[in-house]
Amino acid sequence: MPLYEHVFLARQDASTQQVEELTTQITGVIEGLGGKVTKTEAWGLRSLTYRMNKNRKAHFVMLNIDGPSAVVAEVERQERINEDIIRYLTVRVEEHEEGPSAMMRKADRDRERDDRGGREGGGFRGDREGRGDREGGGFRGDRGPRRPREDADTAAASEE
């Protein structure tokens, strides 16, 4: 039977429990039509690149499906009807990826980075305080002191 990867996005105001119920419902439809769900991953509530149906965030869920195309057609029909599902995408693949998907590996890597601790001084790279001996920033090097500034009246008189 053909293999598919199916991802759907649920509304941001749906609870995690509601998203799990949606996943169970979709899995039931797949298994009822002779398909099989080999892997389910909930990627959690993530920010969207742009607003979709007034949502700035969505719950992402991925399913690996092993079943005929009629299963995918019915799942997509059910998702079109359901108001909690914003978007969905089904892609046919040659084989399912073993282990966690790229999104789950990225989430694990991000968690590891957070565990490393903060920077010394407690700030992020954007804080530029305490740089050099001058107030507000940078090292002046071998530049001498500034020349006195000409007044606007003096500059206008020298041009004439």
UniProtKB/Swiss-Prot annotation:
Keywords: Ribonucleoprotein, Ribosomal protein, RNA-binding, rRNA-binding
GO biological process: translation
GO terms of molecular function: small ribosomal subunit rRNA binding; structural constituent of ribosome
Stretches the record annotates as Disordered: 94-160
Cellular component annotations (GO), alphabetically ordered: cytosolic small ribosomal subunit
Compositional bias annotation for Basic and acidic residues: 94-119, 125-152
Top-level taxon in the UniProt lineage: Bacteria
Pfam family, one: Ribosomal_S6
Family per record: Belongs to the bacterial ribosomal protein bS6 family.
Function: Binds together with bS18 to 16S ribosomal RNA.
Protein name: Small ribosomal subunit protein bS6
Protein species of origin: Rhodopseudomonas palustris (strain BisB5)
Gene designation: rpsF
